[in-house]
C-alpha cells in the first residue's frame, strides 16, 4: 500500500509535527519573507539572513478575523540536547486577516536566531483567534510550549505553519575541530 500524503508532509518529515505541533489541516496562507527569500519548509537560511524580523503575510478573506503568530526554535540550545525546547523568538497577536504581522500587536519582540551547535529548525505557527484578545508576554523565552499556549488562549489547532533550518556560519567564532 502506498504511503498517505501525510507521510510526505514536510512538517511531518521535519518532525515539526510531533516536536512542536500536533497534526493539523492547513486552512490559511502564511508567507514569511526575509529580504527577497521566501521561507519554504526545510529550506536553509544563514543567521546573517535572519537578523531582522521577516515580513509575514497572512491569508484569510476577512480583516475582521484575527490571527496569532508564534516563532519558536525546538532545538535550543542544541538538537542533541534540546533542554530549552521551545525557545520563543517572536509572538504577535491580533493580526487582521489579509494583512501582515506588522499590523498586529507584538507581545514578544523578534529575537534573531543565533544557533551555536547543530542545525536548528525555526518554526512559524499561525493560529486563528476567536476574536481580539489580550495575550500576556511569557516571563521568559526558553521552555515555551506552543501547544500549551494555544490551549491557554483557546486558539485551537494551527491554521498554517512553515519552518526553515539554520546553523552557525563558518568563520563566526568558536572552536575549530579538524579531522
From Swiss-Prot:
GO terms for biological process: cell differentiation; flower development; inflorescence development; regulation of flower development; regulation of timing of transition from vegetative to reproductive phase; short-day photoperiodism; short-day photoperiodism, flowering; vegetative to reproductive phase transition of meristem. Expressed in the inner region of the SAM, stem and leaf blade vascular tissues (at protein level). Keywords: Cytoplasm, Developmental protein, Differentiation, Flowering, Nucleus. GO terms for cellular component: cytoplasm; nucleus. Induction: Expressed with a circadian rhythm showing a peak at dawn and then decreasing to reach the lowest levels early in the night in SD conditions. It holds the Pfam family PBP. It comes from the Eukaryota. InterPro entries: PEBP (IPR008914), PEBP-like_sf (IPR036610), PEBP_euk (IPR035810), Phosphatidylethanolamine-bd_CS (IPR001858). CDD domains: PEBP_euk (cd00866). PANTHER family: PHOSPHATIDYLETHANOLAMINE-BINDING PROTEIN, PROTEIN FLOWERING LOCUS T-RELATED. Probable mobile flower-promoting signal (florigen) that moves from the leaf to the shoot apical meristem (SAM) and induces flowering. Promotes the transition from vegetative growth to flowering downstream of HD1 and EHD1 under short day (SD) conditions. Acts upstream of MADS14 and MADS15. Belongs to the phosphatidylethanolamine-binding protein family. This is Protein HEADING DATE 3A. It comes from Oryza sativa subsp. japonica (Rice). The lineage of its organism: Eukaryota, Viridiplantae, Streptophyta, Embryophyta, Tracheophyta. The gene is HD3A.
